[in-house]
UniProtKB/Swiss-Prot annotation:
Keywords: Cell inner membrane, Cell membrane, Membrane, Signal, Transmembrane, Transmembrane helix. It comes from Escherichia coli (strain K12). GO terms for cellular component: plasma membrane. This is Threonine-rich inner membrane protein GfcA. Residues 22-59 are cytoplasmic. The chain crosses the membrane at residues 60-80.
Amino acid sequence: MKHKLSAILMAFMLTTPAAFAAPEATNGTEATTGTTGTTTTTTGATTTATTTGGVAAGAVGTATVVGVATAVGVATLAVVAANDSGDGGSHNTSTTTSTTR
């Protein structure tokens, strides 16, 4: 069972950055909306603005992506662990992921 969970965790860690790349870019774009002054955005990851609103929104956007990735990883491992009897057979698992922006 320990090896199964390690393999699942490794697979999740390798696929997560690609899965969440688009929302991060979107959040970076949203961070510049509604701000006044000069705003510079680099690939949706870092936002620098002359107004505090732009900086705060950029930080929230980046933190949200990390938080969702962490929550999904923990939930996935919990579901797999709960359904694994350790006998080496296959088990039906169901994972529902909801992301709110």
